[in-house]
């Protein structure tokens, strides 16, 4: 997948960064969430965003161009990557003995049991966050990027998602990025009531 970030595709990465940060808020290398946002960007670039000249995301193009060279195991792995779940989730708790995290996709309403017990202490029941899930061998795993939203804005986030649940994927992604921008503004204007930040008529 490195080929889609270098050489002839390097200018495309630059354009994609502008698009992503225009929609989700520009981060600087000294921002607390810089590494998280860069991880979210790379996943979005590789798995969600269509490269105009190709008419598809890099992962889809890579599979189509190289599928005859893949083993069955590699085909399954790449197909799972192409069908990753990028969404806003709510943390519901853990399974017995805390071996898996239970999260619910707020768009599809589906629940997933995620294999990553190391993260269990990073979550509190009711946490709302943007993340990406990958499936491998029938198990779900988180990608590296997260964007946690203030729990005080639960009703706002739930209501906005409810409005567009049955719209297309592009509209879902647009809202996910808009919420990420609101979170970034909330961090930068921490002295302002979050209710004045999370909204489409916000002055901030």
Regions found by a protein language model. Give the residues of each.
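OB-fold (S1/OB) nucleic-acid-binding surfaces
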Residues: 92-112
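Beta-strand/loop nucleic-acid-binding surfaces
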Residues: 108-122
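Mixed-charge, low-complexity intrinsically disordered regions
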Residues: 1-88, 93-98, 121, 128, ...
């Amino acid at each position: 997948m490195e080929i889609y970030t270098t050489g002839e595709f390097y200018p495309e990465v630059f354009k994609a960064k502008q698009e992503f940060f225009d929609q989700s808020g520009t981060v600087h290398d000294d921002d607390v969430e810089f590494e998280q946002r860069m991880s979210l960007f790379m996943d979005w670039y590789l798995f969600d965003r269509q490269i105009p000249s190709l008419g598809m995301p890099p992962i889809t193009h890579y599979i189509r161009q190289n599928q005859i060279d893949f083993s069955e195991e590699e085909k399954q792995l790449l197909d799972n990557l192409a069908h990753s779940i990028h969404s806003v989730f709510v943390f519901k708790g853990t399974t017995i003995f805390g071996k898996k995290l239970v999260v619910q996709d707020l768009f599809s309403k589906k629940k997933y049991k995620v294999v990553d017990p190391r993260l269990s202490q990073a979550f509190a029941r009711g946490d709302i966050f943007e993340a990406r899930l990958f499936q491998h061998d029938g198990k779900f795993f988180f990608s590296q990027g997260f964007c946690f939203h203030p729990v005080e804005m639960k009703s706002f986030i739930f209501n906005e998602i409810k409005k567009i649940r049955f719209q297309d994927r592009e509209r879902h992604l647009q809202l996910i990025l808009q919420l990420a921008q609101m979170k970034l503004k909330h961090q930068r204007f921490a002295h302002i009531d979050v209710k004045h930040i999370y909204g489409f008529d916000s002055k901030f």
